[in-house]
Swiss-Prot record:
Keywords: Aminoacyl-tRNA synthetase, ATP-binding, Cytoplasm, Ligase, Nucleotide-binding, Protein biosynthesis. A motif ('HIGH' region) lies at residues 42-52. The keyword Protein biosynthesis applies. GO terms for cellular component: cytosol. HAMAP family: Leu_tRNA_synth_B. One of its GO terms (molecular function) is leucine-tRNA ligase activity. This is Leucine--tRNA ligase.
Amino acid sequence: MQERYDYQQIEKKWQKYWADTGMFRLQQEEGRPKYYCLEMFPYPSGNLHMGHVRVYSIGDVVARFKTMQGYNVLHPMGWDAFGLPAENAAIKHKVPPADWTWSNIANMRRQLQSMGISYDWEREVATCHPDYYKWTQWLFLQLYKAGLAYKKKANVNWCPDCATVLANEQVVDGLCERCDATVEKKALEQWFFRITDYAQRLLDDLNKLPGWPDKVKTMQENWIGRSEGVEADFALENPVGGVDKLTVYTTRQDTIFGVTYMVLAPEHPAVEALVSGNPREAELRAFIKKVLSQSEIDRTANDTEKEGIFTGHYCINPLTGEKVAVYLANYVLVDYGTGAVMGVPAHDQRDFEFATKYNIPMKVVIQPEGLPDLDVEEMDHAYEGEGRLVNSGEFDGLINTQALDVIADKLEREGKGVRKVNYRLRDWLISRQRYWGAPIPVIYCEKCGEVAVPDEQLPVMLPTDVAFTPSGESPLTSRPDFYECTCPRCGGKGRRETDTMDTFVCSSWYFLRYCTPKDKDHAFLQEDVDYWMNVDQYIGGVEHAILHLMYARFFTKVLYDLKLVKVEEPFENLLTQGMVLMGGSKMSKSKGNTVSPEEIIAKYGADTARLFILFAAPPERDLEWSDRGVEGAHRFLHRLWRLVYAYSDQIASVPGTMVGYGKGQPNGSKGDNLFSLNSDDRELVRVAHYTVKKVTEDIGQRFNFNTAVSAIMEMVNYFYQYKDKVPAEQQNIPLVKDALARLVLVLAPFAPHICEELWQVIGGGESVYKQPWPTYDEQALVRDEVEVVVQINGKVREKLRVANGLDGEAIKAKVLEMDKVQALIAGKSVVKLITVPNKLVNIVVK
């Protein structure tokens, strides 16, 4: 063994060994349980960042740990490779998106391999490869045939800078999440998936995910946004253009007697009839244009001024018969409920602000109990609390929460309304007017209409030479040789769909492809997905809580219904790791606070980078980058190396690796000879077994990687104490070898390269990852001595070390002999002595 820890030579050596021997190529052995460990695959931007290092280091600890525990472990990696950045690079650098993407993949693969991550690279997938997107297209067709994919004209989120449509989830505070441009509304023919058909199942089945963070489940629950209410019909006083009523959705039917106006979203389908030929038509259309230029977020924000315009029309309250003025307003969205809202200004703050601005009457219909009666003349804000109904006809006197059902009953009985469950979730818009995505496999024929591309004609391949000028249409429209085709049904002239799919479609099923990545004839083989699914541990950022995780759950449920998979949920357990920060903020190039993983690995080694990032914070918390912390992790590995080096010659003469407790005792000898050891040797055994127990539980039960590493560091500290305290000739070398073996084995998932090298020194022969995970003996965890806290009248006054297991009377006697105790109780009478064995003595005096 060389004296100096040469991390560069060691890491290259073992990375080559793992590659040459196929160490992490999946070996599916019968009789072993399966474990599918998966980190969210990255977009191939070209370089890893520290966030990548963190998530992949976490996953690698879990995968290596489970491998050593005897599982068949599936631990794959791939690339979420379609997307707009490749097109932007094509425009900027004059390089085809495919070339840019594959070059980035090659570089990032090399970087991942330099980290020593235990991926089975034979299962690598890239969503931009025709062998992959062929099956993305095939899955689209399965949804299409099941009636879950459809095309319609819709007001969509349009990013003028990206010149493409965005899903609702890709609009953040009214801005494009990719380029921060203000998002506009635009009416286009678009493709959708009917995710709303699965809204209730997506909501209910969150209860089947105890291994998911509550925060993520709450985010999905809020995004699905289930509510229960009624749809009530307000007849138009003067029907116009075929419109004779306006239907509202409300969860507050208890306030229906307090309606004093009606509001429509400017996009509501009845608006054209109300506006056309209206004496105020020009004014109304100008207002509509103004509102449609605003983002939905801005329109509904609490601090946005509520703006509206009276249409000149009235409708009739279905329960009071009163005339209600119909307004258009910016704060009502067509996509939620029916796009029509009843205004109850006395009991809704938003309505109160609107009514105050436009001098609309208010009517109190709920009086709070135990408080002075509300008077609309004196109200400066809406009353939104509970109380008894007033001015509500036959329902006066009812508690408003009780009135919800009886008023719904009356509306249904009179045919003026129906109970309704509503969801905030909208259907998933998957069309993108971009090139670098999976082409939608549909052909349009003048004779046959919309025709699905037959399976045998998949994949619909992307052409390689297209124009990338943002125009609002897909760049594929510049290639007649792509879109001009033959109708597969009638043989006539056809035109291909030129939109491509949202990249989230590609990532909604990749975990299934990993089960059978090379199969040319199937998206995945049934027997393989039946064996591997669902994913036992999924790891990735909480920023994907709504988008990717919701879509992956939807896809899995659809495939379950189509009898293509046997699981309804894709991910059994989910870990959402925190961000890597510098100076309290997320690392980013724009802030100039990034750290290059390549530079850290070159300077300190991959094991140091991994160890620091796993030790610095619990995985679910944000991690503050620290150069000193990195240097500390590096010093620890040097210290470990020197420790093994110091014993390398002596342990070489001891056969085996873990040799048990007594000198020369074979592996597996139990506690029958434990207490024949001297106290120093017993403490070495205790520390070794405690560390195994602690690391096993911290990885296997809690994912507390930071405390596991801390326990390993403490074991090294004790080892140095043992080495310095016990004379060399009295040191129990078989026990030293046993303890070093356990130390290296439990560190192996965290720092794989150095542990491979040290395992060879200890005498392991085979790779450390061919070894079983070490066990521990509970009897070995017992300390020789324990610390007893001494209290007087409940206050801690002293501490005493006594033999473990010493009986209570003997402990009391020792406590009463202590000088400090005698001084404190002098002149007082002892009323009671309370003893908690091995922990505490409390002396009660007066």
